[in-house]
């Protein structure tokens, strides 16, 4: 039953539909088409456009995919939440930079790894900088 229906569509209904389409003999004939004729052509042209897109899609450039979707790739993965506590009195330097990108090999201190991460992903992450206030 299903195959008979498909055969009927392909052998009878599709050719009849294509014969009724107002396809002009020349390109200039498209200018003379009326609005109702354009509306009758619309489904056919839509199917042609879809088939054309599907045919050229493998040759279109791929979108740049993000290298990794996780933020923290390797630091303290055994913990459900990574927390680093730093006592303010322990800041001996006038300025300290702490990592926010999770790529630093000296985590929690920033080593500039965010620069490579930003280039690869288009992100704009930077370090957390703590400075002593001048009195």
UniProtKB/Swiss-Prot annotation:
Membrane topology per record: Single-pass membrane protein
Name of the coding gene: cisd2
Function: Regulator of autophagy that contributes to antagonize becn1-mediated cellular autophagy at the endoplasmic reticulum. Participates in the interaction of bcl2 with becn1 and is required for bcl2-mediated depression of endoplasmic reticulum Ca(2+) stores during autophagy.
Matching Pfam families: MitoNEET_N, zf-CDGSH
Lumenal membrane side: 1-37
GO BP terms, alphabetized: autophagy of mitochondrion; regulation of autophagy
InterPro entries the record matches: CISD1/2, FeS-contain_CDGSH-typ, FeS-contain_mitoNEET_N, MitoNEET_CISD
Transmembrane regions: 38-60
Residues exposed to the Cytoplasmic side: 61-135
Subcellular location: Endoplasmic reticulum membrane; Mitochondrion outer membrane
Official protein name in the record: CDGSH iron-sulfur domain-containing protein 2
Binding site for [2Fe-2S] cluster: 99, 101, 110, 114
Sample GO molecular function, one term: protein homodimerization activity
UniProt KW keywords: 2Fe-2S, Autophagy, Endoplasmic reticulum, Iron, Iron-sulfur, Membrane, Metal-binding, Mitochondrion, Mitochondrion outer membrane, Transmembrane, Transmembrane helix
GO cellular component: endoplasmic reticulum membrane; mitochondrial outer membrane
């Amino acid at each position: 039953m299903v195959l008979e229906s498909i055969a009927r569509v392909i052998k009878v209904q599709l050719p009849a539909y294509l014969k009724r389409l107002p396809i002009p003999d020349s390109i200039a004939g498209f200018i003379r088409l009326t609005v109702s004729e354009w509306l009758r052509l619309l489904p056919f042209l839509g199917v042609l456009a879809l088939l054309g897109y599907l045919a050229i899609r493998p040759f279109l450039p791929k979108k740049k995919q993000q290298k990794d979707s996780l933020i923290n790739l390797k630091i303290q993965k055994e913990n459900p939440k990574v927390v680093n506590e730093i006592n303010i009195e322990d800041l001996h330097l006038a300025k300290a930079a702490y990592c926010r990108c999770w790529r630093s090999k000296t985590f929690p201190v920033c080593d500039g790894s965010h620069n490579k991460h930003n280039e690869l992903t288009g992100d704009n992450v930077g370090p957390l900088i703590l400075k002593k206030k001048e009195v």
